[in-house]
Design a protein with these regions (language model features):
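Active-site phosphate-binding strand-loop segment of PLP-dependent enzymes
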Residues: 1-64
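Amphipathic alpha-helix from the class-I
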Residues: 111-116, 130-152, 162-169
């Protein structure tokens, strides 16, 4: 939460990493909490690296944002006023489009950040093969209804696990609100 983040800031702090929905807990950071975190980051001139790989897989109905106007998605700190220019959003096609193993991901960030990360990426690996790139474009540009179907399947599986563990007296269950 914002208070914990602010308490942990030192003169060496340059960025905060947010993972929402979080894996493996399924915790989703609310839009209100993201706004509080954004204020802390703006006050201390700190960047945010936001891992949003699981953003379309939320199970609560309280998140308000949508994917293509349809299903609820986890809120993004990049949408908070004043945060677009200090946020690096990390995304992947692996989860949303069931393309695990294809190793296709992307960043949403200010142009200067993209230029610098491109230099680093060139030195770390070659490029994603062309077939995977075309498949990624097709996944992003194509129909998104399968994402909702996958989310419903995950929701049903989550419920099976919750029901199975509900009677265990030694466990205190926290119902996951999102993730894979």
């Amino acid at each position: 939460n914002a208070a914990d983040i602010e308490a942990a800031i030192t003169p060496r702090t340059r960025a905060v990493i947010i993972n929402s929905p979080g894996n493996p807990t399924g915790a989703v950071t609310s839009a209100a909490e993201l706004a509080r975190i954004a204020e802390v980051c703006k006050q201390h001139n700190i960047w945010v690296i936001s891992d949003e790989v699981y953003h379309p897989f939320v199970f609560g109905e309280t998140f308000g944002e949508t994917l293509g106007g349809e299903a609820a998605v986890a809120p993004s700190i990049a949408a908070v006023p004043g945060m677009k220019d200090r946020t690096i959003v990390v995304e992947s096609l692996s989860k949303t489009y069931a393309m695990t193993g294809w190793r296709i991901g992307y960043l949403l960030a200010p142009e200067a950040v993209i230029e610098q990360t491109g230099k680093i990426a060139e030195l770390m690996h070659s490029s994603v093969n062309s077939l995977a790139q075309y498949a990624g474009v097709a996944a992003l540009a194509g129909p998104q209804d399968h994402v909702a179907a996958m989310r419903e399947e995950y929701r049903a599986k989550r419920q099976i696990v919750l029901d199975g563990l509900a009677g265990c007296p030694v466990l205190r269950l926290i119902e996951p609100q999102g993730a894979f």
